[in-house]
């Protein structure tokens, strides 16, 4: 794998590892798990949330970065929201629908729905850590 070779060349191979696994099958215990623009593409985001929770240390954090969206369609009728809706219709929803469960959140799920997904996976606390016109960053704790 090229990543391993680059790590070796960079002198960090003994400190890092590269694994390939699905979001519901990765192994290990972590202080931090980070998802970037992907939870809405997953067919079973609740199952994924439950797996992430099981992989976190008791004081661990799950950082979820998702496309920014309001909770109501009317909140997203702006140039960025329209682009996100069109991309989501063509890419995100079909990808999720083709997977196990097929929840099809789409890129415009909105903060309330994302919180519901995360809490349904067993997390007890979710807070908005940051937001821009393009991204929403949520911090979830077991």
What name fits each language-model region?
Residues 10-23:
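Conserved SAM-binding strand-loop segment of SAM-dependent methyltransferases
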Residues 117-142:
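Core SAM-dependent methyltransferase catalytic element
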């Amino acid at each position: 794998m090229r990543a391993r070779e680059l790590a070796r060349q960079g002198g960090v191979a003994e400190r890092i590892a590269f694994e390939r696994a699905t979001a519901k099958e990765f192994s290990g215990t972590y202080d931090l798990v980070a998802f970037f623009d992907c939870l809405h593409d997953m067919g079973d985001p609740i199952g994924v949330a439950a797996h992430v929770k099981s992989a976190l240390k008791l004081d661990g954090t799950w950082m979820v970065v998702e496309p920014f969206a309001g909770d109501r369609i009317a909140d997203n009728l702006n140039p960025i929201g329209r682009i996100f809706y069109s991309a989501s219709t063509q890419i995100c929803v079909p990808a999720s629908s083709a997977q196990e469960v097929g929840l099809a959140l789409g890129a415009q799920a909105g903060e309330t729905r994302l919180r519901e997904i995360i809490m349904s996976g067993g997390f007890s606390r979710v807070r908005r850590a940051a937001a821009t016109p393009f991204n929403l960053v949520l911090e979830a704790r077991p």
